[in-house]
From Swiss-Prot:
This is Transcription factor E2F7. The lineage of its organism: Eukaryota, Metazoa, Chordata, Craniata, Vertebrata. InterPro entries: E2F, E2F_WHTH_DNA-bd_dom, WH-like_DNA-bd_sf, WH_DNA-bd_sf. One of its GO terms (biological process) is negative regulation of cytokinesis. It comes from the Eukaryota.
Length: 862
């Protein structure tokens, strides 16, 4: 068996013979002969693919494959750097990008080659700055025009001082707000349409504020009414609802008016361009004015942007394509944002058939006249030069200028009169200087009184109680003259009772006159109220005839519940303030009191035209009459004709509060119901007839008038006796009969001087109170028994008191002294002194006066 050697690596590498070993050469020759084909074939695989040497030892030369062995695929490893993928993408990019990068590298300085390591750091820093810029960039809401307008308006005051001129630089405002200048232009154009700013130069505006805003809005409303925008709004609203509306002719007329009517307050240089240039008509300023007009003339004050855009597109005669409509809506939305920032409109939502869509509602001023007056009152009085400048700068018409100018002058006059009243009424000295009293103080007081009493007079006139209402309210202001004041009769007559129960006429007795208080006042026709400087009460007492005493029961003008006149109890409750008013009555600058207080307006016309009666049964009336007749004292007769009554104070004397309150002096008026007295009527002045017809009321005998001594000096009483039939016609002008003329005994009077301690009587039963009249319910009749013992003292002191008061017959004085002759300061104790110091009057009549000695007659009770 032949042994062959294995093929080694040495054999593959070198094919040369080794001459040093002949044996080997023989063997190699033999091998070459044997393996001739294999000598060439192993070289071919070396070129194509390497041989796996690890397997060569197990293979024989015969077993070596001719084709190469396929190597198993392995997964590729991750890239070495994070930017390997980026580099691969850059390499795959277009050649233009690579050429651009090459050009940048060519133009870079040579030094950059040394600092290539810092390029990556700079790129990282740039990326961080970009992130910060994105965070600092404002949001869409922050860039809105409404918020930008609020920031712009916050830089300037709404009502700047007229002396300061504020200039707006658009470049400065844009840089400070961090926006482009075109955004500031949008705001300024809308503000210029409302005259809040005015253009001075390029990018320079003057700030005026909202001083003239109401006037501008009023003018815009006037122009909008001329353009008939209200009909156009209604037309488009009905069109949206699918209804037909005939407004084509109105729209044509509106377009003609619009072409002929220039908008307000355009400068002289702008007026020709406005009428000729369509570009000027489409400007944001003109569009803003028209948009505001739509709000001012609208009835609902709500406008949608669609309707506004349609009206403005038709007005500008543009092609109504969709692109123009969207442009108009965007421009109107910018205007609405600025107006919202000004507080003139607000955004609302309107629901219609198509759904919910946004709209804007007007919340700005509507009544411009009232706000103008309010603003003028709060401002200071300008100088004449500034008034002229304001009138020249005013954008209103000539008619409005004249009205505003008159109003400013009225403010000046009003302030002067206010200062004059303040100086005249200032209590700088205890006695006012001699001279005529200023009527401004009277006018101010009476104006305040008019506001209180006028609603009541109007209510009465509506109910038909006042027949002649030509003068709803009038007063009598006392002015010093050279003669006595006379009582003028009222034209219309008011019946108090029926004609069957009336036998004698009655008139009004004016208060007695003195040198210090000469204050008889005349009545004006249709005069509901009368103002008197002194507290005076007119008393009308009516009486039925003696023969009809049993047929006709007591009648009273004290109203029933529901009437406006007070009852006797209400009148008594309102008298506790009388001492204060009596003291103020003698002061020259005291507020002049009315005849009627707030609670005691017995002069209500309703209570006069309708006789309001509270009747009593004959048994109750006779019981009261017997009790009073038992305590009746004889009185002295009077024979004076045409005498007048003295002042009785401003209210009816109370009859219940006797010695209950020490601070308030006891005061009461006591009239017993004798056999001839069946009615007691009180009439407080002064809006009714002063002279009644002779067949209206019966006269009255007043046997008792009881007054305490503390109030005697301030409240004297003088009653007149019977008036003859011949003289009654001449005394009807302002005087009253208290007794029946020629048929009955003359009037009897007792004035009680001392204070009478009267115990409080028990109150009547409830069932009797309901049936009795106010005079019968009052506990006056119960006081008679306790007052009998003091009646003689009352009579003796009444004679002394009656001598203090001279003849009540008025005589014309030489000169009427003003009302401010009294001392400026008075104490409550000086009332008696002032009344006792009244000078005596000369007696002009020959008839016996009331100051004669009173005869005490026990049989004079009738």
């Amino acid at each position: 068996m032949e042994v062959t050697s294995c093929l080694t690596l040495k054999d593959l590498i070198s094919t040369k013979k080794n001459k040093s070993d002949p044996v080997a050469d023989g063997r190699s020759a033999q091998k070459e002969n044997m393996f001739d084909r294999f000598k060439i074939s192993p070289r071919l695989p070396l070129r194509s693919e390497p041989i796996d040497l690890s397997k060569q030892k197990s293979f024989t030369p015969e077993r070596i494959p001719v084709t190469p062995v396929k190597v198993a695929e392995r997964p590729q490893a991750d890239p070495w750097t994070p930017t390997a993928n980026l580099k691969m993408l850059i390499s795959a990019a277009s050649p233009e990008i690579r050429d651009r990068e090459k050009k940048k590298e060519l133009f870079r300085p040579i030094e950059n080659n040394g600092i290539e390591e810092t390029d990556t750091d700079l790129q990282l820093m740039d990326s961080v700055d970009d992130i910060d810029d994105l965070e600092k960039r404002p949001s869409r809401k922050q860039k809105s025009l409404g918020l930008l307008c609020q920031k712009f308006l916050a830089r300037y005051p709404s009502y700047p001082i007229s002396t300061e001129k504020m200039t707006i630089s658009l470049d400065e405002a844009a840089s400070s707000l961090g926006v482009e200048r075109r955004r500031i232009y949008d705001i300024v154009n809308v503000l210029e349409s409302l005259h809040l700013v005015s253009r001075v130069a390029k990018n320079q505006y003057c700030w005026h504020g909202q001083h003239n805003l109401n006037e501008t809005l009023r003018n815009l409303q006037h122009i909008g009414e001329k353009q008939n925008y209200r009909a156009q709004i209604a037309c488009f609203n009905l069109r949206d609802m699918g209804m037909e509306y005939k407004c084509d002719e109105q729209e044509k007329g509106c377009h003609i008016d619009h072409l002929n009517t220039p908008l307000i307050e355009l400068s002289e240089a702008d007026c020709p361009s406005v009428s000729s240039s369509s570009r000027k008509d489409k400007s944001l300023r003109i569009m803003s004015q028209k948009f505001v007009m739509l709000f001012l003339v609208s009835t609902t004050k709500i406008i949608t942007l669609e309707i506004a855009a349609k009206i403005l597109i038709e007005e500008s005669q543009d092609a109504a394509d969709h692109s123009k409509f969207k442009t108009k809506v965007r421009r109107l939305y910018d205007i609405a944002n600025v107006l919202t920032s000004l507080g003139l409109i607000k955004k609302v939502h309107v629901t219609d058939e198509r759904g919910r869509k946004p709209a804007f509602k007007w919340i700005g001023p509507v009544d411009f006249t009232a706000e103008d007056q309010k603003m003028e009152v709060t401002t200071t009085i300008p100088s004449p030069d500034s008034k002229k400048d304001a009138c020249n700068l005013s954008p209103a018409s000539d008619r409005v200028k004249q009205r505003l100018f008159r109003h400013s002058s009225f403010n000046i006059v009003q302030s002067f009169s206010a200062v004059k009243r303040k100086v005249c009424s200032h209590p700088c000295s205890p006695q006012k200087p001699q001279g005529v009293e200023s009527s401004d103080s009277y006018a101010s007081k009476m104006a305040h009184l008019a506001t209180i009493c006028k609603p009541k007079a109007e209510e009465d006139s509506k109910n038909g109680n006042i027949e002649n209402s030509s003068l709803p309210f009038s007063v009598v202001v006392p002015m010093p003259v050279d003669s006595d004041y006379r009582v003028k009769p009222v034209v219309h007559q008011v019946p108090l009772v029926s004609h069957k129960t009336v036998c004698e006429p009655l008139g009004i007795m004016p208060p007695s006159q003195s040198n210090e208080d000469c204050t008889n006042h005349g009545f004006v026709p249709n005069q509901p109220y009368m103002y008197l400087p002194s507290n005076s009460v007119f008393m009308l007492c009516g009486n039925l005839s003696e023969g009809k005493a049993t047929d006709h029961l007591a009648m009273s003008l004290y109203p029933v519940p529901g009437s406006d006149s007070p009852t006797l109890e209400e009148t008594t409750m309102s008298k506790q303030e009388r001492p204060t008013k009596r003291q103020l009555n003698d002061k020259d600058d005291a507020p002049l009191s009315l005849v009627l207080p707030k609670k005691s307006r017995v002069d209500n016309t309703q209570s006069l035209q309708k006789p309001i009666c509270k009747t009593t049964t004959p048994e109750q009336l006779q019981h009261v009459s017997r009790e009073e007749e038992y305590n009746t004292e004889p009185v002295t007769k009077h024979s004076n004709v045409g005498e007048t009554t003295e002042e009785v104070g401003s209210r009816i004397l109370p009859h219940e509060n006797v010695h209950l309150h020490p601070a308030v002096p006891p005061q009461f008026l006591y009239v017993p119901t004798t056999q001839g007295l069946n009615s007691f009527n009180f009439l407080l002045p002064a809006n009714h007839s002063a002279g009644l017809s002779q067949s209206q009321l019966a006269s009255l005998n007043v046997p008792y008038v009881m007054v305490p001594s503390s109030a005697l000096t301030a409240f004297p009483f003088i009653c007149s006796p019977a008036v003859s039939s011949g003289a009654s016609g001449s005394t009807l002008n302002g005087r009253m009969n208290f007794s029946q003329a020629g048929t009955s005994s003359p009037t009897r009077l007792i004035i009680g001087a001392p204070q009478m301690a009267v115990p409080q009587p028990p109150e009547p039963a409830v069932d009797q109170t309901k049936n009795l009249s106010p005079l019968s319910v009052s506990p006056v009749s119960a006081k008679c028994a306790s007052s009998k013992a003091d009646s003689h003292d009352s009579l003796s002191q009444s004679i002394h008191t009656a001598k203090l008061h001279k003849s009540p017959t008025p005589s014309t004085p030489k000169s009427i002294r003003p009302l401010h002759k009294d001392a400026f300061f008075k104490t409550p104790g000086s009332l008696d002194v002032s009344s006792s110091r009244k000078p005596q009057r000369t007696q002009t009549r020959t008839s016996s006066s009331a100051q004669r000695k009173l005869d005490i007659d026990s049989s004079a009770g009738n």
